Every structure is written in structure tokens, then in C-alpha cells.
Amino acid sequence: MRRVSIFDSTLRDGAQGSGVTFSVEDKLKIVKILDQLGVECIEAGNPGSNPKDLEFFQRARQIPLRYAKLVAFGSTCRKGRRPEDDENLRSLVQAGTDFCTVFGKCWRFHVDCVLETTEEENLRMIRESCRYLKALSLIHI
């Protein structure tokens, strides 16, 4: 029989819906329920952009989980910064999760207008961020 792994992003992506807000207590309760359901990975928030998520990860470490692994979410390092000196990546490490999810921009418009950097610098940010987190065993490529 094939094994199905579930990666749930309700606590991170679902919280971006209009009118949706989760308190730290809400998130802790939902984590327990998802674990009871056998969900393997729970992407629970972005500790680098939200103090409430940072508090959640600190408190969630105390919850004994049977099945689930918590996953922190965040972006690559900022332009001109080394990954080990970037506050956002530092918050992913400090979240204390077994894994993390990172995103990088790939649309030229975002690279130019949101990141305000070159394609080469953007690729460096992605490459070095992934290399740094992989060395800490927080991502698997």
C-alpha cells in the first residue's frame, strides 16, 4: 500500500484569508487536532514577520506530538546579506522546528520591483539561503 504524506498549511496560508485570524491559543489547539488526525507536517507560521508566530513556536515546543512535525515558513535572506546574518533566517532557526519552508522570488517583476535587486543577486540569495539551511538540516532539497 502506498503511503500518503500530508503537508498542512492552514495555520500559515489559511491565516491570510480575509477576516481570518488565529490566536496563539487557537494555533496550539489546531496543532493538537492535526496531530491526532495523523498529519505529518504542519506549516505553522512565519516567525520572522509576526511576533505572534514567534511566540507560538516557543510555546509549541512544549506540546508532545505523536505524528506531526512543525514547519516554520519564511523568505530567503535579504539582498546584500549573508544568510547567517539575516534576521528572517535567524528566526527560522530559532523557531526550533525540524524543518522549514523558504520561498524565493522568481518572477522578474518581483525581483526588480519588490526585491529591488538584480537577477544575479536574487539567485545568490536563494542559493546561499538554501545552502545555509541545508547545512543546519532544516531543509531537504
Regions found by a protein language model. Give the residues of each.
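Active-site mouth loops of central-metabolism enzymes
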Residues: 10-26, 73-83, 111-120
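N-terminal glycine-rich anion-binding loops that anchor highly charged ligand groups
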Residues: 2-8, 23-40, 50, 55
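Glycine-rich, proline-tolerant flexible connector loops at the mouths of alpha/beta enzymes
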Residues: 40-64, 73-77, 104-116
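Non-cysteine beta-strand/loop elements that form the S-adenosyl-L-methionine
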Residues: 8, 97-106
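Conserved, mostly hydrophobic/aromatic
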Residues: 14, 34, 100
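Acidic (Asp/Glu)-rich catalytic clusters
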Residues: 60-65, 89-97, 131-135
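Conserved small/polar residues in nucleotide/adenosyl-binding loops
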Residues: 139-141
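Aromatic/hydrophobic pocket-lining residues that form the small-molecule binding cavity
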Residues: 27, 53, 85, 122-126
